[in-house]
Amino acid sequence: MDIPSSNQIQHGQRSERNRRMPRASFSSTATTSTAATLTSAMVLDQNNSEPYAGATFEAVPSSIVSFHHPHSFQSSNLPSPHSSGNLEQRGRRLTESEPLVLSSAEQSRSSSRNPSHFRFFTQEQISNAEGASTLENTDYDMAWDATPAYEQDRIYGTGLSSRRSSIRSFSRASSLSNAKSYGSFSKRGRSGSRAPQRLGENSDTGFVYHSATHSSSSLSRYTTRERIPIELESQTDEILEDESSTHSLESSDSRRSASENNRGSFSGHDDVHNQHSEYLKPDYHEKFYPQYAPNLHYQRFYIAEEDLVIGIAAYQTSKFWYIIYNLCCFLTFGLVYLLTRWLPHLKVKLYGVKVPLAKAEWVVIENEFGEFVIQPIDRQWYNRPLSTVLPFENYPNPSYEPNDINLSHHHANEINPNVPILITFEYRYIKFIYSPLDDLFKTNNNWIDPDWVDLSTVSNGLTKGVQEDRELAFGKNQINLRMKTTSEILFNEVLHPFYVFQVFSIILWGIDEYYYYAACIFLISVLSIFDSLNEQKKVSRNLAEMSHFHCDVRVLRDKFWTTISSSELVPGDIYEVSDPNITILPCDSILLSSDCIVNESMLTGESVPVSKFPATEETMYQLCDDFQSTQISSFVSKSFLYNGTNIIRARIAPGQTAALAMVVRTGFSTTKGSLVRSMVFPKPTGFKFYRDSFKYIGFMSLIAIFGFCVSCVQFIKLGLDKKTMILRALDIITIVVPPALPATLTIGTNFALSRLKEKGIFCISPTRLNISGKIDVMCFDKTGTLTEDGLDVLGVQISEPNGVRGQKFGELLSDIRQVFPKFSLNDCSSPLDFKSRNFFMSLLTCHSLRSVDGNLLGDPLDFKMFQFTGWSFEEDFQKRAFHSLYEGRHEDDVFPENSEIIPAVVHPDSNNRENTFTDNDPHNFLGVVRSFEFLSELRRMSVIVKTNNDDVYWSFTKGAPEVISEICNKSTLPADFEEVLRCYTHNGYRVIACAGKTLPKRTWLYSQKVSREEVESNLEFLGFIIFQNKLKKETSETLKSLQDANIRTIMCTGDNILTAISVGREAGLIQCSRVYVPSINDTPLHGEPVIVWRDVNEPDKILDTKTLKPVKLGNNSVESLRECNYTLAVSGDVFRLLFRDENEIPEEYLNEILLNSSIYARMSPDEKHELMIQLQKLDYTVGFCGDGANDCGALKAADVGISLSEAEASVAAPFTSKIFNISCVLDVIREGRAALVTSFACFQYMSLYSAIQFITITILYSRGSNLGDFQFLYIDLLLIVPIAICMSWSKSYEKIDKKRPSANLVSPKILVPLLISVFLVFLFQFIPWIIVQKMSWYIKPIVGGDDAVQSSDNTVLFFVSNFQYILTAIVLSVGPPYREPMSKNFEFIVDITVSIGASLLLMTLDTESYLGKMLQLTPISNSFTMFIIVWVILNYYAQLYIPPSIKGWLKKKKSSKKYKLLIQEEMKLKEV
């Protein structure tokens, strides 16, 4: 195994730095000109090789994006695909037409746990198909950098170029600004008094199209004709003229008659309408697109929001074969219909004709999980440029000026053709639109209007015409789930294979004259159907009510404010956020003016309110860039309002009349819409238990077929008539494969979910519960999860002057009165006073708190820091005027009035007795005049501050110490900076650094215009704030329980690595004596490793660069593996470096890190997400528990995500716990194991019940007899159903065992004992049957007697089988280690007692009594009764001990899980 050396890693590292493209966010993607098809190739490649177990999805924004963005670490080193087909004729870029090829390098990395299961499409078709994606123009080079440009300049130098070197320059947004007429409508061209103009003849089609000017004076909606080409209009006029001339020849009486009958007035218009509709048919496609000949018959599409690959094929209906199909359905009494309903691909093969995508009448869509649907194609007149409906890609080079390219947005041209007909279909509430330019279906979820970069333009709102265009293109702004009608649900239920089999069985039983049994089963089936109907309607209604939202909004339309329904909003609309009617945001929008506070807990599970600020011009440029990559950056998210979030406060800025926002996404294209889709269409889990259950049913079906054949042979020997023989043989099938068998899978799960709900744990994905029983590794966030939510301030350490030696840290101050013991902030007499005053001011002002109804809202750390000061915080402060004496334009005036802004103010709290500051001193009133919010990429925030009547402006910055030290003047850093920092972090404390400076210009205007880059540069270091984060009391105990259960525990946090290690040790998560941390060698010599692993306590001790094993001191030899007791702690930058270029690094090296790391620190949200994926690659079943928005990506990616949130059901994770500690993890695992074992036991019980009845019936069939009608009823309804339900009521066992329950239903260790049990059942029925025939009181059965089944054979087998049903349930009701002992299941004990008592009672029943006659029993002797009792007791012990003992003899199947094989190899090395 080779260590990643400098010429492996360093090459990527140095080339990366030379390009200035550090990868700060793994979910981010580079927006370059790389082919969209190459992008999709990578996407498919990832999907086939990386197990994304979640749903498709930090500071709040990035986490929300993580819901629906694919996370990849692949660099752009995939082999170039070759071109496929002559595509240049379609006006497409060659790079966009390259086929989607699979990368062998990526395939060799690791096999996916969720391989594609395309059945309709072949793998070759999917691999070679042309493709599109919701990620337009993305090349998946994961060196994308979310860090703002100026921060890149600071880190990497100003002489280097960057792919994203500036928010404006070298970005797609820049090209948007130069060609912003694309995809939008110029205000000059769309309004005003100019008459409508025709654009002239389109060179592409030969048709002339309407310009359709959208005058604000026009109040009428477009008619259909206004969207129809001019040439077709002329044909319309000819039709109308012909109609007119025809009518003129009619007699006046005829005309009067026609008028009276309301026919003459519209007959001509009907012809026109029919003629227009005729042109919408696929046959006329070339008439409108002569230069865009369709060639592709199928395509592939990657839905990034759901991390889903789908195949799309185009078809038309063959009329001849459609008639044949309907005829076959009629002649087979609907059997063909049922088959094609259950197997829809047969319908496609029967009457579907393959056609090009553009000519489809309907499309076949299959996703990678084999889910198959058929969707109709919708065609409607549109007659607008392509860029108005689909994201436009061919933007001109930024170096060109708009005047040079001479393009107009509503002029069709070669790269932006007119779209006369909009060809669409809908899949999972996503609208797919055909692009003639690419000959592919695409989506417009992330469509942008280039005019958005100009805030002065967008603030004018839309015209009525543009709104109607966009409503046609994007649909209504509503998330309305189409609820099936009662008849539809009923129809689907009745035609489900389960109920069809039930109907078949009932008909069979009716023909066989089992009327009572058939009637009862029919009644139960009807009740079950209606119960399922009500449940489905309830669930769909709840989901629809949760997703649907409607309100009235005030919108700027045609430059006038009007009130409309929120469903009429379209991208680009300007609406009023401060409208009291709006309490929940109706769409995804960008805040344009004022500020507001929102609660995003419904989306993220994060209960901390989030502040939103008005967008700037830079924000809009970045928004355009972000939409191209579907990644909403933290920078943009500070102004981004997500659909479905609650507005806590919308504060109107002084001088403005309302808080305004612009709509950017609507309906299902919004973040909420994507999340609702993920709930309605959950990704199949692929859990082995469910796959095996159907294999198991198949196995039982083989037994049924065998029984069918044996019975037929036996009936022929007995000479039964054909009708009886056929009925009896078919009855065998209904017995061996009971229709209720699949339903038993959900019994245990439903009871477990109810128990979890009682504990405050809610689940939105029930299938994940059984998976939780198989968890191998559990990952935890630190702050708020393992530790308390609130941080307590331990104290502060101020940087003090140290004479000629520079600066040093003072003593730890735990009392705020020791920080600056003065009465006024202006009272400074020494350098130390100035330093202390400035540090104190940073504590007072550098935070993101907001005041709502007198309560402070914001980040808990900020809250604790400000609470430590004992001062007061007020917004909209007007008690005291803040003067700006050096304002150039407004000398000596009060600046809030000049600037129309009143600052937030901090001042001494007069109610605080410990306050030493003077209340009325103007210097003690600090106004926060500007804030630079915290960005997760920068890991810091800043504010600009001014005192009440001083002319000085300060800037203060706080953030991670290692980040703050980089932007400070080095001379101001204390000499013991690293030593003090290491001391605190090593002991588990959280450290925040503060810095500040005086701004060079003392004007209000300068404070509002100065860039963040300038504010956060050349700062004076001020000091540290030290927080202590106490462990939650349940943390250590829970972690110990997990470790005792052999479940690996991992901490995954954004905190400092030393703090994480300290907390890990305190919590017991780290139990090894040594912890090795990595460091990156920035200047390695040739061949030297870039990453060096050192002992955190003894840096001289390192790990071997090849094996990652401890190295002995002196001779550099590897220590004995038996003596190794260590773990690894990985930092985010190292994790990024390793897994970004994972194909270049030995797999063994990466596996060693993943297997031995207990701590992952300084991890970004996307890195947490990727860690889940990397662990899943080793075949771990991964759980993740977190409490905030930072963890949303990891919660969705993990096999089992548990969110600690106040929301009852957050879409952020499958499980949401109101228990705010990690003990809920134990509950989920316990109930998961109990549910899995219960489902397993119920499934086995139903199988053995079928086997017992099958053996009984087979023996009776051999004598030409059967069980009686009421005997079947007694067994099935009074014995089996109550037992199966009561079995499922067993609660979970308190202790979690080391061994995980098996989920393999078809392994030899399950099937062999099952077959032994079946043999024992047969043996213990066969012997009494043989013996009874020798009794003197023996009554022979009547051969073929349907009504009279009284016989000793029947009675004895009925009694014996009754006990077998009961005792089998007892044998299968296993208690510990996964469920409570059977004795604690009170309901089960009662049911078993009653059942045994009833069975004993039947044995003593008088056969001449009413009940005896009903059950058709015959008398047996008392001695034989005792024999049966003793015999069934022997049967019980035989079943209890024999199958398990045989199971123990079977060799345990070797685990195929990759991580287990690696651990076994390592154990072998240790033994050697």
From Swiss-Prot:
Instruction: Report if keyword Phosphoprotein is assigned.
Output: yes
- What follows loss of this gene? Confers sensitivity for growth for cadmium, manganese, nickel, selenium and iron.
> Where is it found, in Gene Ontology cellular component terms?
fungal-type vacuole membrane; membrane; vacuole-mitochondrion membrane contact site
Molecular function via GO: ATP binding; ATP hydrolysis activity; ATPase-coupled monoatomic cation transmembrane transporter activity; cupric ion binding; manganese ion binding; P-type ion transporter activity; zinc ion binding
Where is this chain compositionally biased, Acidic residues type?
Answer: 234-243
Q: Where is the active site?
A: 781
Task: List the EC numbers from the record.
Answer: 7.2.2.-
Vacuolar compartment spans = 316-321, 512-514, 714-726, 1265-1271, 1332-1351, 1408-1423
Q: Where is the composition biased (Polar residues)?
A: 1-12, 72-87
Annotated GO biological process: intracellular calcium ion homeostasis; intracellular manganese ion homeostasis; intracellular zinc ion homeostasis; transmembrane transport
Which positions carry N-acetylmethionine?
1
Q: Could you tell me which Pfam families the record lists for this protein?
A: Cation_ATPase, E1-E2_ATPase, P5-ATPase
Query: Which keywords are on file for this protein?
Result: Acetylation, ATP-binding, Magnesium, Membrane, Metal-binding, Nucleotide-binding, Phosphoprotein, Translocase, Transmembrane, Transmembrane helix, Vacuole
What residues bear Phosphoserine in this entry?
A: 108, 1117, 1120
Superkingdom, natural source? Eukaryota
Record membrane topology: Multi-pass membrane protein
| InterPro entries the UniProt entry points to | ATPase_P-typ_cyto_dom_N (IPR023299), ATPase_P-typ_P_site (IPR018303), ATPase_P-typ_TM_dom_sf (IPR023298), ATPase_P-typ_transduc_dom_A_sf (IPR008250), HAD-like_sf (IPR036412), HAD_sf (IPR023214), P-type_TPase_V (IPR006544), P5A-ATPase_N (IPR047819)
**Where, in residue ranges, is this chain on the Cytoplasmic side?**
1-293, 345-488, 534-693, 749-1244, 1290-1307, 1375-1387, 1447-1472
Q: Which residues cross the membrane?
A: 294-315, 322-344, 489-511, 515-533, 694-713, 727-748, 1245-1264, 1272-1289, 1308-1331, 1352-1374, 1388-1407, 1424-1446
Q: Where does it mainly reside?
A: membrane
Catalysed reaction equations from the record: ATP + H2O = ADP + phosphate + H(+)
The positions making up the signal sequence are none
Q: Where in the cell is it found?
A: Vacuole membrane
Q: Which CDD domains match?
A: P-type_ATPase_cation
Quote the protein name from its UniProt record: Vacuolar cation-transporting ATPase YPK9
Species per Swiss-Prot/TrEMBL record: Saccharomyces cerevisiae (strain ATCC 204508 / S288c) (Baker's yeast)
| Name of the gene this protein is made from | YPK9
